[in-house]
A protein has these predicted regions:
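Bacterial N-terminal signal peptides that target proteins for export
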Residues: 1-8
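Cysteine-centered motifs
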Residues: 12-14
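C-terminal motif of bacterial Sec signal peptides marking the signal peptidase cleavage site
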Residues: 17-18
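Extended, histidine- and acidic-residue-enriched regions that form the cofactor-binding/catalytic faces
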Residues: 24-136, 140-156, 162-349
């Protein structure tokens, strides 16, 4: 299995790809139908099977999108990553359509599944706001969906998500590699390659907040300044109480594993009160260029194996290794419980 190091991992970050003006409503409110001579955006669930069969296998891209449900503090909906992954997909489609008007873009409905939650770092494994599945389950879903597309001859599959948990990312990278190698297609985990370059742009944050701003606020990450800003830009679901939230300072990634021992943690880090839609717009515009560049490399057939990949780009950390071992232990216990129950049920048949 891909080497996993859980350092910055639990800073669940959302990669949204966009370059649209602030006054324009999010594209993710609905896929756009184009003329029927190519260059269409097609919702898979709305097509008949003859219509699917007419799609060009080479000049089309299937977008396989995952949006997990996870606590994001008292101010951002638990569907934060879901909404942002949806935005990634639609806004990247806009960018790609401009560059490749001959391609059909096929939109698979967002799958609301993900592994882990930032609350796990606080040892709150059953947090009321997080609905997660096991790593092996997520990997299997991604593989099966990818195979279902690739086995029909469609050559391009872009996997989009918005969650920073390491095993979540590894599941998608392994699934993409399996489908690509087994079926001779290009299934690319776009988001984890973007994360390999970094999350939110320090340059953008410094521009808006001033250099050294995080000396007071700490690293921005899960439901903090950056992520709250991104949500403010994308939709109107952020609770106005974000303006009154006190900073929860984590000085560096090593401090992530101490949050469960500190009083007052409400499911976020950094300082949500400093967020703004304007910051979110600029962070997103930075991310769109990186995501689009990776997508272009994939479409041109470039070897992506030399690109930095999350979480393989993280440094080693004993606390992370211990946490990862505990996570696999919990999953093994759950799987053993399920296996025992199924065996008992089958004995009675």
């Amino acid at each position: 299995m891909t080497s996993v190091r859980l350092t910055l991992a639990l800073v669940c970050v959302c990669t949204i790809v966009a370059c649209m003006p602030a006054e324009e409503p999010p594209v993710s409110q609905g896929a756009e139908q184009a003329p029927m001579n190519g260059g269409r955006v097609l919702k898979l669930e709305e097509l008949t099977y003859p219509e699917i069969d007419e799609i060009d296998r080479d000049q089309s891209i299937f977008f396989l999108t995952f949006g997990n449900l996870e606590e994001h503090g008292p101010h951002i909906p638990v569907g934060s990553d879901y909404y942002q992954a949806n935005g990634v997909r639609d806004l990247l489609i806009k960018r790609l359509r401009a560059a490749h008007p001959e391609y059909d873009m096929v939109v698979v409905p967002v799958i609301p599944l993900g592994e882990g939650g930032f609350n796990d770092a606080a040892h709150q494994f059953d947090h009321v706001g997080t609905f997660a599945i096991r790593y092996s389950t997520l990997q299997a879903v991604a593989i099966d969906m990818g195979v279902s597309i690739a086995s029909k001859g469609f050559q391009n599959i872009f996997l989009i998500h918005s969650h920073g948990a390491p095993l979540h990312n590894v599941a998608f990278t392994e699934a993409s590699a399996f489908v690509s190698e087994t079926y001779g297609v290009r299934m690319v985990n776009i988001t984890s390659l973007v994360f390999g370059e970094g999350f939110y742009s320090d340059a953008v944050l410094d521009k808006h907040l001033g250099e050294g701003w995080n000396q007071e606020s700490g690293i921005t990450g899960h439901a903090g300044t950056g992520e709250t800003s991104a949500n403010l830009f994308l939709h109107d679901l952020v609770n106005p109480n974000y303006r009154e939230l006190e900073p929860f300072v984590v000085e560096d990634s090593f401090g992530i594993f101490d949050i469960g021992d500190r009083n007052g943690w409400q499911g976020y880090i950094s300082d949500p009160s400093r967020a703004s839609a304007l910051i979110g717009r600029d962070l997103i515009n930075d991310l769109v260029e990186r995501s689009f560049r990776i997508a272009e490399l994939a479409l041109s057939g470039e070897d992506l194996s030399s690109l930095p990949l999350y979480p393989d780009n993280l440094p080693p950390m004993p606390e992370a290794d211990a946490y990862l071992a505990a996570t696999f232990g919990r999953y093994a216990s759950r799987e053993a419980e399920i296996t025992a129950w199924l065996e008992k049920q089958r004995e009675g048949r």
